[in-house]
Amino acid sequence: IVERCHLNRNTFYYHFQDIPNLAEYTVKSWADQIIQNNYEFGSPMTCLVPLIEECNQHKKAFQHLYNSSQKDEFITYMNHVALHIVKMFMKQSSHYVLRSEQEKETLIHFYKCLMIGILIDWLEAQGDYDLKPFVEQIFHLIETTIQAH
């Protein structure tokens, strides 16, 4: 990395602890940019569609990280990124403003776990199914189940 970017090691380690820290920073920056470019969130699905499209575009990079010797670190920082994304969504979504703090925390935890579970399943399947229709179906099932009760 330092050779390719024409940096010395001290400069790199001044900004980042290690390569997983750099990867987490990169993915968070990438997610923030997607969120900012798609600011108007109506539902969790409208938040996730741009992220899903980006995951599909960067499938090989995600698979490489997931299948690497640093799989545990990758999953850990994806948990951090998913939590970050869900919290950003919650802060910007008017649908959740009136919820109690406990309800917000529960919803944040639920959506984070849902995102990570879907991502890990997709990576385990080597990305051989299209994430977008799969996630759309999940949210449709969630909505219709909630409306039925």
Where are these regions (language model features)?
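Hydrophobic alpha-helical connector segments
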Residues: 36-61
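C-terminal peripheral helix-coil segments that are non-catalytic and often amphipathic
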Residues: 113, 121-149
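Basic/polar phosphate-binding segments, predominantly the helix-turn-helix DNA-binding elements
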Residues: 1-21, 54-57, 61-65, 69-84, ...
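An amphipathic alpha-helix adjacent to DNA-recognition modules
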Residues: 3-6, 13-39, 49
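Secondary-structure edge/capping motif, primarily at the C-terminal ends of alpha-helices
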Residues: 38, 62-66, 93-96, 122-126, ...
